[in-house]
Amino acid sequence: MFFISANLFSQSNFEKGEKLFAQKKYNEAKIHFDNYLSQFPLNLKTIEYLGDIAGHNKDWDEAIKYYEKIKQQNPQNANYHYKYGGALGMKAKESNKFAALGMIDDVEDAFLIATKLDKKHIESRWALVIFYIEIPAIIGGSETKAQVYANELMQLSKVDGYLAKGYIDVYFKRYKNAEINYKNAHTIGNSKTTFEKLYDLYLNKLKEKAKANKLKELFEK
């Protein structure tokens, strides 16, 4: 009887944690996940949730700790490597340049492993596009490499492919090329994301307010 009660209590902790997490009540969810993990210390989903909560709270060291644990327990899971690389990348961004340099290779490796483990993993390919564009060429940044993963995204999702190419064009101030890519993405996707990218380009980069207003009017119909 006690075993059944304890099991129901622990299950209740996990379900409550999931519900609170879905409601974005992360700190409350953490209490329930911590309780559940104390009884089931190898439950990967719980550890992943705790990593996600740490990430939402920008506690990168804590997020890295959790994601490293789950990727070691299940090294074939692409998403675990992607999340580990993402948390490590955010820590690198907020660290001094010397400390960040020591993390760059591990960030890149984590994203690359994710792409190799899952040929359809969109998030890790997006991460590599941004990674290769944002880091200096002297430590591995490369538009050519970024375009490789933008092309892979194009094969998986036309919207993501055009958005990735538009992102690269905006970074290098090729705004007319970016307009073509963002328009293609918006024509296919017609989503809040595609609208916002094209609207921002018109308003803040091309300084074409009339186009921005027309786009907004059509999107909000």
Map each language-model feature to its residues.
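Structural motif corresponding to the intra-repeat A-B loop/turn of tetratricopeptide repeats
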Residues: Q23, N57, K91, I135, ...
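Residue-level recognition of tetratricopeptide repeat
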Residues: N43, N77, H121, K158-D160, ...
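Residue at a conserved register position within TPR or TPR-like alpha-solenoid repeats
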Residues: L20, A54, L88, S95, ...
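Structural marker of alpha-solenoid helical repeat scaffolds
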Residues: Q39-F40, Q73, L117, L153-L156, ...
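N-terminal leader/linker segments that initiate helical-solenoid repeat arrays
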Residues: N7-Y49, G55
